[in-house]
Amino acid sequence: MTEQFQHRARKRFGQNFLHDAGVIDKILRAIRAKPEDRLLEIGPGQGALTEGLLNSGAQLDVVELDKDLIPILNSQFASQPNFNLHQGDALKFDFNTLGAEPRSLRVVGNLPYNISTPLIFHLLQNASLIRDMHFMLQKEVVERMAAGPGGGDWGRLSIMVQYHCRVEHLFNVGPGAFNPPPKVDSAIVRLVPYETLPHPAKDHRVLERVVREAFNQRRKTLRNTLKLLLSSDEITASGVDGSLRPEQLDLAAFVRLADTLSEKVLTE
């Protein structure tokens, strides 16, 4: 980077810039971008992945919040015809403005860890536009996404991500791959939205409500955590044992509870 464009990572943006060439290459090989792809990179930072993505020949839109990084990115990539830069907050970005076909967007990002979970929920609201997503995240977050029922990692994030997507924990990345090094390990995850949901709920917003309510007090039984939404009899009628704790239920069971609540709301 030239002296003119020196940039320090900003703590308030959760910035840790990827610089390890071996890790960058491994990520690019996992993505396998092709010229016909439509790519969206969130938080390109100083462009560690951007160059390799552009070299694939694919159309690349990037969304960057930090205004001070805009001239750095433009100086490196603005001359390339397949590069399009959007300065703004990815949490507020309207993905429909990209004009992408359904299930065509391939989303990539070394996501700031302080906004990774809300950003993923924002992306899941646009899952119909997305073909796949490859993210660098805190390792602990990836483990929660990929978790199964019965353990401490299984929770709201696991259930709602797995409702929409197939989850693959690809590989881990140590702190030394970044500048400055974060205090935690990182991991690359691949999320592939389902064309047909394996466990479709009547209303996914009701499912979100049930899951959120259940895990607000995850050490209590379902009949206690859900008592404001469903009676003990209604939980049993859903084919669920009300004496279980939320972490003991799989996705299909939560969908049944949500559908019972949806029917209850309609009849009241």
From Swiss-Prot:
Keywords assigned: Cytoplasm, Methyltransferase, RNA-binding, rRNA processing, S-adenosyl-L-methionine, Transferase
A Pfam family recorded for this sequence: RrnaAD
Top-rank taxon: Bacteria
Gene3D superfamilies attached to this UniProt entry: Ribosomal RNA adenine dimethylase-like, domain 2, Vaccinia Virus protein VP39
Compartments where located: Cytoplasm
InterPro entries: KsgA/Erm, rRNA_Ade_diMease-like_C, rRNA_Ade_Mease_Trfase_CS, rRNA_Ade_methylase_Trfase_N, rRNA_adenine_dimethylase, SAM-dependent_MTases_sf
HAMAP family: 16SrRNA_methyltr_A
Protein name: Ribosomal RNA small subunit methyltransferase A
Lineage, uppermost ranks: Bacteria, Pseudomonadati, Pseudomonadota, Gammaproteobacteria, Pseudomonadales
